[in-house]
């Protein structure tokens, strides 16, 4: 079983190259494994959309998506694409957990999605908005804090990087930043041991 977020990962903002996607596909096929491809951010690409790995593994994959990142944050509705037999099994599991997701929310979403042009226009608008914010923020960081090393995002919602000086404790630093009404997530929160480090995850979409 392989679980991956190949597009604009949270927190690292990493996106798999085409070569790495092909390598993952080859490994899953070789061992007759199962791939869970989690894609909550894949539609938030700025220039080029990557091919889904699961598209090459129709019988050996689950492809997960969410509308909370692309439409409305409070709309906690997602979807799973898999072969028919796997979906049947998932339905039984879902019913045993909570019967079903909110019917009203699903109905509202279904009505909205009937207009594919409207939804695609919305996606393009937020892609353009996020791209402008990401590039502005990245340029500002490189100009004002050049010792903070990072890659300019190519999609998604996050910018991740770290200070050259590994002695900088970003967990302690955020306490001071909060006094100036500036907030970020110190990267030690994403590690098992929670040991302070010099890395930061920013969200540039607000």
Predicted regions and their residues:
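PLP-dependent class I/II
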Residues: 1-206
């Amino acid at each position: 079983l392989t679980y991956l977020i190949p597009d604009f990962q949270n927190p690292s903002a990493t996106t798999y190259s085409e070569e790495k996607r092909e390598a993952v596909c080859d490994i899953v096929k070789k061992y007759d494994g199962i791939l869970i491809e989690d894609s909550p951010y894949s539609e938030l690409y700025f220039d080029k959309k990557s091919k889904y790995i699961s598209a090459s593994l129709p019988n050996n994959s689950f492809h997960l998506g969410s509308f909370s990142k692309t439409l409305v944050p409070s709309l906690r509705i997602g979807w799973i694409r898999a072969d028919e037999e796997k979906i049947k099994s998932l339905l039984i599991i879902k019913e045993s957990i909570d019967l079903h997701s909110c019917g009203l929310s699903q109905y509202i979403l279904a009505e909205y999605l009937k207009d594919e042009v409207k939804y695609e226009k919305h996606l393009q608008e937020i892609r353009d908005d996020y791209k402008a914010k990401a590039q502005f923020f990245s340029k500002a960081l490189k100009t004002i804090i050049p010792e903070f090393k990072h890659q300019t995002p190519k999609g998604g919602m996050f910018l991740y990087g770290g200070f050259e000086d590994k002695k900088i404790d970003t967990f302690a630093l955020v306490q001071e930043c909060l006094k100036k009404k500036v907030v970020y997530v110190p990267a030690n929160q994403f590690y098992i041991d929670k040991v302070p480090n010099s890395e930061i995850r920013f969200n540039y979409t607000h």
